[in-house]
């Protein structure tokens, strides 16, 4: 029997590249924008405010908005503009209210900000907005991914003009010449399932935690940050594993113009840090002596005032975004660094937009309550020499 002949399929002519891109773009646009504008939940704020008003919430609308989301309406709109394209172009299924209306970009951003600002459970945040727990989870993570990518320009090492301004302000405010910032660390505490609870993550206070290191300017803006490392390591080791350390050691930053002091000494650029850090040519720690001289005491007082800038910044960060100050319940350790980074970006955005924090927002106590500084013995001669010059300079 002769083999059956198969019919030839008509081959479609391939679309040229330009037409294919245009077709895909149009398809995305159609899928992303609802046909019925009334199906979008645009009056979310009025509904939310009515649902969540209480004696502890300010009666003034603008103050109430900032109370819930840590940002003014103007700053909130700017944040929405950063992530709008991402939130529209990749809408997951199920992003609807209990009433059945689609979530607007503004409401998605509000849900994410409220989750980060309050640190409340996804169930509680969902109830406050009239959405389910899974919606809060999806919305928050999509917002984090989008802002992490779109707000990078709010956290980068300053250019030379800005560095000169920072150095001038630190000297004017605290008397330390050529100082570029203050460095410090804080712990993000979490619980871990038994299978993940290794000693690496168990810190000196027997908590499971992740480190966050920040370098701050005089306005308490992050100039640099690193996170993701276990709280069980020492601060000096965290520093050496950080990109900031490599940049400084390779003279890619903190290598600007030195300043000549009245006694003729040349002072290079540096940051100040506490006793947990090593004394390096570009990282100046306080004098540690059982019998300090008057000049050492005077230097340490100035040094502590600069270092307190970083401590206050962490108080504001953890007070504004309380998800960082509460004990996190079994977080995904791969995602946690992104959550921390986005909170740092939001911290800078609020400052960059000229916004302000309400008085009750910063933590009332220390940002790392219960953690004592562990002394680092490492001392480099050039660092010791620079500290000596600064100490002598403050006596004049």
Curated annotation (Swiss-Prot):
Interacts with core components of POLYCOMB REPRESSIVE COMPLEX 2 (PRC2), a PcG protein complex with H3K27me3 histone methyltransferase activity. Associates with plant-specific PRC2 accessory components such as MSI1, EMF2, VRN2, FIE and CLF. The keyword Metal-binding applies. InterPro entries: HARBI1-like, HARBI1_dom. Changing residue 273 to E: In alp1-1; suppression of lhp1 phenotype. Its cofactor is a divalent metal cation. Residues 1-12, 20-29 have a biased composition (Basic residues). GO terms for biological process: epigenetic regulation of gene expression. Transposase-derived protein that may have nuclease activity. Antagonist of polycomb-group (PcG) protein-mediated chromatin silencing, probably by preventing the association of POLYCOMB REPRESSIVE COMPLEX 2 (PRC2) with its accessory components. Needed for full reactivation of several floral homeotic genes that are repressed by PcG. Disruption phenotype: Suppression of PcG defects in several PRC1 and PRC2 components including lhp1 (in alp1-2 and alp1-3 mutants) and clf (in alp1-3 and alp1-4 mutants) phenotypes. In alp1-4, weak downward curling and slightly late flowering in short days. Increases synergistically ult1 and ult2 floral organ defects in double mutants alp1-3 ult1 and alp1-3 ult2. The double mutant alp1-3 efs has a stronger dwarf, branched phenotype than efs single mutant. Belongs to the HARBI1 family. Residues 1-29 are annotated as: Disordered. Keywords: Hydrolase, Metal-binding, Nuclease, Nucleus, Transcription, Transcription regulation. It holds the Pfam family DDE_Tnp_4. This is Protein ANTAGONIST OF LIKE HETEROCHROMATIN PROTEIN 1. The keyword Ligase does not apply. A motif (Nuclear localization signal) lies at residues 6-13. Residues 183-348 form the DDE Tnp4 domain. It is an enzyme of class 3 (hydrolase). It comes from the Eukaryota. One of its GO terms (cellular component) is ESC/E(Z) complex. One of its GO terms (molecular function) is nuclease activity. Expressed in roots, inflorescence stems, seedlings, leaves, flower buds, inflorescences, and siliques. The lineage of its organism: Eukaryota, Viridiplantae, Streptophyta, Embryophyta, Tracheophyta. Its main location: nucleus.
């Amino acid at each position: 029997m002769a083999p059956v002949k198969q019919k030839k399929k008509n081959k479609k002519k391939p679309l040229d590249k330009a037409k294919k891109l245009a077709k895909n773009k149009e398809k995305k646009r159609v899928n992303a924008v609802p046909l019925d504008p009334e199906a979008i939940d645009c009056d979310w704020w009025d509904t939310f405010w009515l649902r969540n008003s209480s004696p502890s919430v300010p009666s003034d609308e603008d103050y109430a908005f900032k109370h819930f989301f840590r940002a003014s309406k103007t700053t909130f709109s700017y944040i929405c503009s950063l992530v709008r394209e991402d939130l529209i172009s990749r809408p997951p299924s199920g992003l609807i209210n209990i009433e059945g209306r689609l979530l607007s970009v503004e409401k998605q951003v509000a849900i994410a900000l409220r989750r980060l600002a309050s640190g409340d459970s996804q169930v509680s945040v969902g109830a406050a907005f009239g959405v389910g727990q899974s919606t809060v989870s999806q919305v928050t993570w999509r917002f984090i991914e989008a802002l992490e990518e779109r707000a990078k320009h709010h956290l980068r090492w300053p250019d030379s003009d800005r560095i000169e301004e920072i150095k001038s302000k630190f000297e004017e405010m605290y008397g330390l010449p050529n100082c570029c910032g203050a460095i410090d660390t804080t712990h993000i505490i979490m619980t871990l399932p038994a299978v993940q609870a290794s000693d690496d993550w168990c810190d000196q206070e027997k908590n499971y935690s992740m480190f966050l290191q920040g370098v701050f300017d005089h306005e308490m803006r992050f100039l640099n940050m690193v996170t993701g490392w276990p709280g069980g390591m020492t601060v000096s080791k965290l520093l050496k594993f950080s990109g900031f350390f490599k940049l400084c050691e390779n003279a890619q930053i903190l290598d600007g113009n030195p300043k000549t002091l009245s006694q003729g000494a040349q002072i290079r650029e540096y940051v100040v840090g506490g006793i947990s850090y090593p004394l390096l040519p570009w990282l100046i720690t306080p004098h540690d002596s059982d019998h300090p001289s008057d000049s050492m005491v005077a230097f340490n007082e100035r040094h502590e005032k600069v270092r307190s800038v970083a401590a206050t910044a962490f108080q504001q960060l953890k007070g504004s975004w309380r998800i960082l100050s509460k004990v996190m319940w079994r977080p995904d350790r791969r995602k946690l660094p992104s959550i921390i980074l986005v909170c740092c970006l939001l911290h800078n955005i609020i400052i960059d937009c000229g916004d302000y924090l309400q008085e009750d927002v910063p933590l009332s106590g220390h940002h790392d309550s219960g953690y004592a500084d562990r002394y680092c013995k490492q001392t480099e001669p050039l660092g010791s020499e620079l500290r000596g010059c600064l100490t002598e300079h403050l006596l004049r």
